Design a protein with these regions (language model features):
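Extreme N-terminal starter segment of soluble prokaryotic enzymes
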Residues: 1-3
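Short amphipathic alpha-helix with an adjacent loop that forms part of the alpha/beta core around
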Residues: 35-43, 136
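Two-component/phosphorelay signaling modules centered on CheY-like receiver
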Residues: 16-25
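Short hydrophobic/Thr-rich beta-strand motif most characteristic of the beta2 strand and flanking loop
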Residues: 25-31
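Catalytic beta-strand/loop cores that center a nucleophilic Ser/Cys/Thr
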Residues: 113-161
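Acyltransferase
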Residues: 172-193
Length: 193
């Protein structure tokens, strides 16, 4: 079972449907309706932290969940969830170079992590006005994808722990290879830690 932390975003259930379509059971909990003990009691095989409005500081249980469970369970952060992963390890979240609400960008990547087998220079939907401050990217994390048009970080992963973040929206119908990226995360959750 995969636990989806809902950050009060309209895209959350698009993610739920995309994951469920791959045969996975998904349990959804709002970021203010579950605590760390509740997460542990559910014993999920993986956690996905959804997009949402605001900043990681306003994302309920998300920062504490990452701080306490990183390395013990695979975690994928999407948009706000991506930012939460960076901030939980000491990264700074800053205003993005450009506000990108419902805009398409070409995404270039290095073929690592979630992008193994994904063609380079694909199109993805972005909905964000905040981004990870690259000089503050925490130790142990690597950038795996960027937006071609503005160079903004579009994906990170941890070199040792199963932690992945994507700033763009893989669940959007307008994102090329979004389903394959989500499938890649699911396949990584099936490996023993």
């Amino acid at each position: 079972m995969i636990l989806m932390i809902d950050n009060f975003d309209s895209f959350t259930y698009n993610l739920v449907q995309a994951i469920a379509a791959r045969g996975e059971e998904v349990v959804v909990r709002r970021n203010n309706a579950i605590d760390l003990g509740g997460v542990r009691a559910l014993d999920p095989s993986a956690i996905i932290i959804s997009p949402g409005p605001g900043t990681p500081d306003n994302a309920g249980v998300c920062l504490g969940l990452i701080e306490n469970l990183a390395g013990t369970i695979p975690i994928l952060g999407v948009c706000l969830g991506h930012q939460c992963i960076a901030q939980a390890f000491g990264g700074r979240i800053v205003h993005a170079r450009k506000v990108m609400h419902g805009k398409l960008s070409r995404i270039t990547h290095n073929g690592l992590g979630l992008f193994d087998g994904i063609p380079d220079n694909f199109s993805a939907v972005r909905y964000h006005s905040l981004a990870i401050d690259e000089p503050s990217l925490p130790e142990g994390f690597r950038v795996s994808a960027r937006a071609y048009d503005d160079g903004e970080i579009m994906a990170i992963f941890h070199e040792i722990m199963p932690l992945f973040g994507v700033q763009f929206h893989p669940e959007s119908i307008a994102t090329d290879f979004g389903e394959e990226i989500l499938e890649r995360f699911i396949s990584l959750t099936r490996r023993p830690l």
